[in-house]
Amino acid sequence: MLIGVGTDIVQIPRIEKILHLYPELFAKKILTSQELKQFVLLGKIHHAAFLAKRFAAKEAVSKAFGVGIGQGINFKDITILNNDLGKPIVEVSSNYTNKLSPFNIHLSLADDYPVCVAFAVIESSYNVILG
């Protein structure tokens, strides 16, 4: 059963400006500890695109849940990692998922300066009603 679909587009220059003003604060606000470890290992040239993709991904996932960031789910409730082939893998904290049956989240990310886009689809093998 389809639970929801979400998409988000982020202007990378917008994230660059935020990073210039608040270099560490912004990353710590939206990234989980696992994501921060990846972020630190990147060269600074990749920081804005990395953050833009994570921001867009988390917005898209929250929209697919039908709630939006700050409306029942927060940035740190969602972790975006990559498998060995680079495919994005989404983990959602148990604080949020305890309310739901088992589900799968499919996420696609793309960036082509100056924009990045995220598209999320959430499905379940059970009938679920959100809201």
From Swiss-Prot:
This is Holo-[acyl-carrier-protein] synthase. The gene is acpS. The keyword Lipid biosynthesis applies. InterPro entries: 4-PPantetheinyl_Trfase_dom, 4-PPantetheinyl_Trfase_dom_sf, ACPS, Ppantetheine-prot_Trfase_dom. It comes from the Bacteria. Its cofactor is Mg(2+). Keywords: Cytoplasm, Fatty acid biosynthesis, Fatty acid metabolism, Lipid biosynthesis, Lipid metabolism, Magnesium, Metal-binding, Transferase. One of its GO terms (molecular function) is holo-[acyl-carrier-protein] synthase activity. Its main location: cytoplasm. Mg(2+) binds at D8, E59. It is an enzyme of class 2 (transferase). It comes from Rickettsia massiliae (strain Mtu5). Its EC number is 2.7.8.7. Belongs to the P-Pant transferase superfamily. AcpS family. Transfers the 4'-phosphopantetheine moiety from coenzyme A to a Ser of acyl-carrier-protein. It is found in: Cytoplasm.
